[in-house]
Structure formats: C-alpha cells, structure tokens
Amino acid sequence: AARVLDENPHVRKIVLLGAEEELVKSLPEKYKDRIAAYNEEAVVHDRIWEEFRKKHIEVPVYLTIDKDILDPSQVKTNWNQGKMKLADLKKVIYQILLHEQVIGVDICGECTGSILEEAGRKEMEQDDRINGSLLHLLEC
C-alpha cells in the first residue's frame, strides 16, 4: 500500500478491508492519514461499515479484491488468509458499488494448486467458482 502511494500520484487514499491490526500499527506515520483500515470482523455490522465508508471513501474508487481475505474454507489462496466468508465480502463489494463511483476493479489472490494434481484441480475449480461469483456481482 505504501509503495502505491509513493509511486502513483493519482492515488490519494487506500482503504484496506480485513487488514491485520499488527500491519496497520506498523505503518509509518507519514501514511496514517492516507491509509484507512477496516477490521474484518466489523464487516457484518452494517452501521459500522456505513460510518466507515462515509468517513474514508470520498473520491472515485479503484477496487482491488484480494481473495486472501477469505477463509480457507471458502477458497485456498497463495498467501496468509483471513476469516471472511464470501457472502460478507460480496456484501461489502455491493455496498461500494451501490454508493461509490467505481472506476476500475481487479481480482487477485489465486489458488496455488497444480492442475496436474487432483487436489489442485479441485482448488482451481473452487477458485473459478469464487471468481465467477464475484464477476457476476460486478456485472450487475
């Protein structure tokens, strides 16, 4: 996040959904007013999200959906994973799409499975289902 703020003058602020508290606390002071973090557990509380959104999202949004935020029971990715359920992630994305000017989207956090292994194929199929579900939401 800090690198993006340093290298891209068009990015004014980054909102991290589901960032670990230790990561947020370790941010250098110069970024504290340009990086806002939303706790993963608070996602299910609509009023808390609404207050956070109004306070921290005031410009057009480029949305990066990192599937690493999802619980491993939802999808296995190539990084440390969070605990969020897909339904909760989709709820937050829907609120952003509904209330903000979204100028672009990308999805990252692909599975690590190998297509040559049975377990890897299952992980890829699960990953494809998650991608399809997210893309369907974005198309609506």
Predicted feature locations:
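Conserved alpha-helical scaffold segments that buttress catalytic/binding sites
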Residues: 1-140
